[in-house]
Amino acid sequence: MASNLTVNVHPGVYMNVVDTHMRRTKSSAKNTGQEKCMGTLMGYYEKGSIQVTNCFAIPFNESNDDLEIDDQFNQQMISALKKTSPNEQPVGWFLTTSDITSSCLIYHDYYVRVITEASARRESPPIVVLTIDTTFSGDMSKRMPVRAYLRSKAGIPGAAGPHCAIFNPLRVELAAFPGELVAMQLIEKALDSRRREATLESGLEQLETSTAQMIEWLERMLHYVEDVNKNGEKPGDAQIGRQLMDIVTASSNNMQPEKLDTLVKNTLRDYVMVSYLAKLTQTQLQVHERLVSA
């Protein structure tokens, strides 16, 4: 069923939408009704889910009951993004609003035509509508309300055709690639800063932080296994047990402890040497730049 689809939205999509909203709000502070932002969602389809990995805003206007969309700009952006990322295709559109309005029907009809023409499928693919309430007018005061919908046509039994359309809500989840997770963890560190800034750590500091996190998680897993096997304080979970077995299987390489210790030391020594050479090169470039500009 189409209503069982899950919409996985990546962090960059939310950042692009919020950035577009802030820019449009500043540029149209004197124009009433111009604070909304609309754009195209890029991504790909998977079994039971839609991955939304990128997006871009398009110029549009809905003042004075006139709905205008810059189709040429939209088509050019879709073509450019498909050249840079061939795996991505238009999968829907977004609108910064608290609820579905009557204008959404016209916008959706436009995107049905655009996405159907750009799709290689014979049938029209599922086209998702993502609404983002940037005014926080919903019940969630600390989280920005985000909803996804899929339009379906409805009609009276025995009628010649459908007479209305229904936007069915879909499940929305936050998904991220490994690189995006690293960036999000770095951004979260700025939440405790007054200036809302996060500094990049050096190579050795990042290695130290990652090692400390790994040790912390290993201690948590060890305590969990001890509580289940020896103390009996926690009931066993088959799913967690399988995940722990997968971790042990993936980490075991049938290597003797002496060889493993030598491999770790050599790898760390190589990493330190590369980091030292990078710092030395950076210092030489800075000195050369000062000598040239002097």
Curated annotation (Swiss-Prot):
The family classification in the record reads: Belongs to the eIF-3 subunit F family.
Q: Which GO terms describe its cellular component?
A: eukaryotic 43S preinitiation complex; eukaryotic 48S preinitiation complex; eukaryotic translation initiation factor 3 complex, eIF3m
Provide the protein's localization.
Cytoplasm
- Which UniProt keywords are given for this protein, alphabetically ordered? Cytoplasm, Initiation factor, Protein biosynthesis
Annotated GO biological process: formation of cytoplasmic translation initiation complex; translation; translational initiation
One GO molecular function term?
translation initiation factor activity
Where would I find the MPN domain in this sequence?
A: 7-155
Q: How does it assemble?
A: Component of the eukaryotic translation initiation factor 3 (eIF-3) complex.
Q: What happens when the gene is disrupted?
A: Extended lifespan in adults.
UniProt lists the gene as: eif-3.F
What is the protein name for this chain?
Eukaryotic translation initiation factor 3 subunit F
Q: Which Gene3D superfamilies match?
A: Cytidine Deaminase, domain 2
Enumerate the InterPro entries for this protein.
Answer: eIF3f, EIF3F/CSN6-like_C, JAMM/MPN+_dom, MPN
Question: Which function does this protein serve?
Answer: Component of the eukaryotic translation initiation factor 3 (eIF-3) complex, which is involved in protein synthesis of a specialized repertoire of mRNAs and, together with other initiation factors, stimulates binding of mRNA and methionyl-tRNAi to the 40S ribosome. The eIF-3 complex specifically targets and initiates translation of a subset of mRNAs involved in cell proliferation.
The organism's place on the tree of life at top rank = Eukaryota
